[in-house]
From Swiss-Prot:
This is Serine/threonine-protein acetyltransferase HopZ1a. Autoacetylated at Lys-289; while autoacetylation at Lys-289 is required for virulence function to some extent, it is not essential. Its cofactor is 1D-myo-inositol hexakisphosphate. The modification N6-acetyllysine is found at residue 289. Changing residue 216 to A: Abolished acetyltransferase activity. Reduced ability to trigger host TIFY/JAZ proteins degradation and altered host infection. Pfam families: Acetyltransf_14. It comes from the Bacteria. Keywords: Acetylation, Acyltransferase, Allosteric enzyme, Host cell membrane, Host cytoplasm, Host cytoskeleton, Host membrane, Host nucleus, Membrane, Plasmid, Secreted, Transferase, Virulence. 1D-myo-inositol hexakisphosphate activates protein-acetyltransferase activity via an allosteric mechanism: 1D-myo-inositol hexakisphosphate-binding induces a conformational rearrangement that stimulates the interaction with acetyl-CoA. Acetyltransferase activity is activated by phytic acid. It catalyses: L-threonyl-[protein] + acetyl-CoA = O-acetyl-L-threonyl-[protein] + CoA; L-seryl-[protein] + acetyl-CoA = O-acetyl-L-seryl-[protein] + CoA; L-lysyl-[protein] + acetyl-CoA = N(6)-acetyl-L-lysyl-[protein] + CoA + H(+). GO terms for molecular function: inositol hexakisphosphate binding; O-acetyltransferase activity; toxin activity. One of its GO terms (cellular component) is host cell plasma membrane. It is found in: Secreted; Host cell membrane; Host cytoplasm, Host cytoskeleton; Host nucleus.
Length: 369
């Protein structure tokens, strides 16, 4: 479950060059092998739904200029199954401010902020502002203080005369390979505690939805939108945190990677007082709309309580769509780097790629009005 975008600095911006990435050596151009590989690329995009999103974005990218054009082309290439050599965690973060602006315009009251690190989040807790807001920020390496690629989302409530309550949604796992993720979450918790926030009023929710290596920014953006749309349910969670409790934690914590580690440890591995839970136990079903794994979607829908069996698309659609149907509609076969960083042919839902294409389209549509 070490499938998180780690290492490197968020501040080092990558420039995607589709010409450089896709142009073969002269000796390979227009050869049968080249044509066969091109046909193979086309076959990898097997989802008609994803192809529609690709087609919707193409005309906007065609008329775009500058870095956003390169970003859009990179997203199109990835969604089409072409090989790209860039980190989308970095590309997404570079263009996140534009997406945050668009989503704040589309969703009054979202109050979404993009912070450079968790320390900016702490500063926002101590300043005048809306009583409810969401924030996306990269994690920080405890050893070097360097911001990393992996991003998370925090849903925040400020309480008059009391300490804030914070729900951090982790799109992948809390622990991670060699406990690196856990150490970074612990750094955030430590700094929150030193700033005066009781850790009994902080929860980390692990969804395990992110299986690809670098889609954390898109998951975090989607989670912020979903948290706002399900604000009443989040209000209930915040109300419990005000009293130092998180419902179902006694059973749910064991279903997280943190709980699995704690079961084999004789000491506390996360800062004492902070809460942890598995996303499917506390979050609405639409938080798993873009989950990559069909196995996970099927397992969630088999829950006895039925809380993950509902629709994940909006009421505006004529037909309801559940987790498995969504996953199958965006399922593609593509060569990806998996957790062990070895190439493998695999099938998964590229729904999160579709979300990225949609967000880029919204940014470009605003620019080209």
């Amino acid at each position: 479950m070490g499938n998180v975008c780690v290492g490197g600095s968020r501040m080092s911006h990558q420039v995607y060059s589709p010409d450089r990435a896709d142009t073969p050596p002269r000796s390979e151009r227009n050869t049968p092998d080249r044509r066969q590989r091109a046909a193979g690329d086309a076959e990898r995009t097997q989802s008609m739904r994803l192809q529609q999103k690709i087609n919707d974005l193409k005309p906007y990218v065609r008329h775009a200029r500058g870095p956003i054009k390169a970003y859009g082309q990179a997203a199109l290439d990835r969604a089409s199954g072409k090989k790209t050599s860039v980190s989308f965690a970095e590309l997404d973060a570079t263009h996140l401010d534009a997406m945050v602006y668009i989503e704040n315009q589309r969703n009054p009251g979202l109050n979404l902020k993009h912070f450079r690190d968790h320390k900016e989040l702490i500063q926002a807790l101590q300043s005048d502002g809306p009583s409810a807001f969401r924030a996306i920020f990269p994690q920080t390496c405890p050893e070097t203080g360097q911001t990393l690629k992996h991003h998370v989302m925090a849903d925040v409530r400020l309480h008059q005369g009391g300490a804030p309550t914070i729900i951090i949604t982790e799109p992948a796992v809390i622990v991670g390979a060699r406990y690196q993720q856990l150490q970074r979450h612990n750094l955030t918790l430590e700094d929150l505690s030193e700033s005066g926030v009781p850790l009994s009023q902080v929860a980390i929710i692990e969804t395990q939805a992110q299986k690809t290596s670098d889609d954390c920014v898109m998951y975090s953006l989607n989670y912020a939108i979903k948290a706002h749309k399900n604000a009443a349910q989040f209000d209930d969670i915040h109300h419990g945190l005000q009293h130092g409790t998180l419902s179902t934690e006694s059973e749910s914590r064991a279903r997280t990677t943190l709980g699995a580690l704690e079961a084999s440890s004789s000491y506390s591995v996360m800062h004492e007082g902070a809460h942890a839970a598995f996303g499917a136990d506390v979050l609405p079903v639409d938080f798993y709309k873009h989950g990559a794994s069909l196995t996970q979607a099927k397992q969630l829908m088999k829950r006895p309580d039925g809380r993950m069996a509902g629709r994940v698309n909006s009421e505006g659609h004529s037909e309801a769509e559940n987790l498995v149907q969504r996953n199958q509609a965006f399922r593609v076969k593509r060569r990806e780097l998996l957790d062990d960083e070895t190439p493998s042919n695999t099938q998964f839902s590229a729904s999160i790629d579709g979300f990225r294409l949609q967000e880029i389209k919204r940014v470009l549509a605003e620019e080209q009005r």
